[in-house]
Design a protein with these regions (language model features):
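N-terminal mature ectodomain segment of secretory-pathway/periplasmic proteins
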Residues: 27, 33-111, 140-146
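Bacterial Sec-dependent signal peptides at the C-terminal "C-region" and cleavage site
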Residues: 21-29
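Short, conserved active-site entrance elements at the starts or edges of catalytic domains
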Residues: 122-159, 178-183
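Short, low-complexity, Pro/Ser/Thr/Gly-rich segments in the mature regions of secreted, periplasmic
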Residues: 240-254
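Bacterial N-terminal signal peptides
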Residues: 11-21
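Bacterial N-terminal signal peptides that target proteins for export
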Residues: 1-12
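Gly/Pro-enriched, hydrophobic low-complexity segments
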Residues: 89, 153-244
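Acidic/charged, solvent-exposed loop-and-adjacent secondary-structure segments enriched in E/D, K/R, S/T
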Residues: 104-131
């Protein structure tokens, strides 16, 4: 047997063995559907989520490397209405939201902006009330792709692919099944960026276990720490809270 023939057979044999090993490793991973449903279970259960129809969150944020601090207030109502206001010391106010149809942002630095394309698709996902519970309505495919270590914990990596827009990767702690990392490709007027988020400090608000600290790692800007200080479920939110600002109406009317 000449060396090239032997080498070729060894390579083929190695490829076969590796393919079998990879297939068996994939079989050992729990299905993404199981992980996503278990997350709902460990954070309170389907019935607890279904009791909530609106929500107000208040908290703070801090850009560690830049020393910038601010406050955050978020209003959300089913099925997909939202309004968020961030006030940064020395930099003014940033707002974004949707009335369920038009998705927009407005800031003292960037002015008014109506989201379209991939940016709009991303906003549709983030504004959906109880998105974690209703993931089957939002994603055309979910798949467990492997294991990743996050802050010393082994986690299952789940890739969720929406009908439109980029895939989202979420990592769930093997032991607790709590989500400990999310990676998205964020679209904005400034371009496309990969953003890693690390939810921690899970505590109960009412019947739900929720993260009260979320660290985001932003390219070129370092870490941003969001701290949730209060969560109110089923508040009466005036309908005009989700109305389009005049500046956004003007942009819409130009189209």
């Amino acid at each position: 047997m000449n060396r090239s023939y032997a080498a070729r057979n060894i390579a083929i044999g190695t490829a076969v063995v590796l393919s079998i090993m990879l297939a068996r490793a994939a079989d050992d991973l729990p299905k993404a559907e199981t992980i996503l449903d278990k997350y709902i279970e460990v954070t309170g259960g389907k019935a607890a989520y279904q009791k909530h129809h609106s929500e107000i969150q208040k908290g703070t944020l801090e850009f560690g490397a830049m020393g910038i601090k601010g406050t955050l207030t978020s209003y959300r109502a089913e099925p997909n209405k939202s309004y968020q206001e961030v006030e940064l010391t020395g930099l003014g106010k940033t707002q974004e939201g949707t009335d369920g149809k038009v998705f927009w942002s407005l800031s003292s630095m960037m002015g008014p902006h109506v989201k379209e394309g991939a940016e709009k698709a991303q906003a549709v996902l983030s504004s959906t009330f109880n998105a974690d519970l209703n993931w089957r309505d939002l994603f055309k495919d979910v798949k467990t792709t492997g294991v990743e270590t996050v802050d010393g914990k082994d986690c299952y990596k789940v890739v969720l692919t929406p009908a439109e827009g980029g895939a989202i990767t979420q990592c769930y702690d093997k032991q607790s099944n709590l989500m400990v990392k999310m990676t998205i490709t964020a679209e904005s007027p400034l371009g496309t960026q990969t953003v890693d988020s690390f939810p921690t400090d899970y505590r109960k608000d009412g019947d739900l276990l929720m993260p009260h600290k979320i660290k985001q790692v932003l390219p070129g800007m370092g870490d941003v720490m969001f701290t949730i200080e209060s969560v109110t479920f089923n508040p009466e939110i005036p309908a005009d809270r989700f109305a389009l600002p005049d500046e956004i109406k003007a942009l819409v009317n130009k189209k």
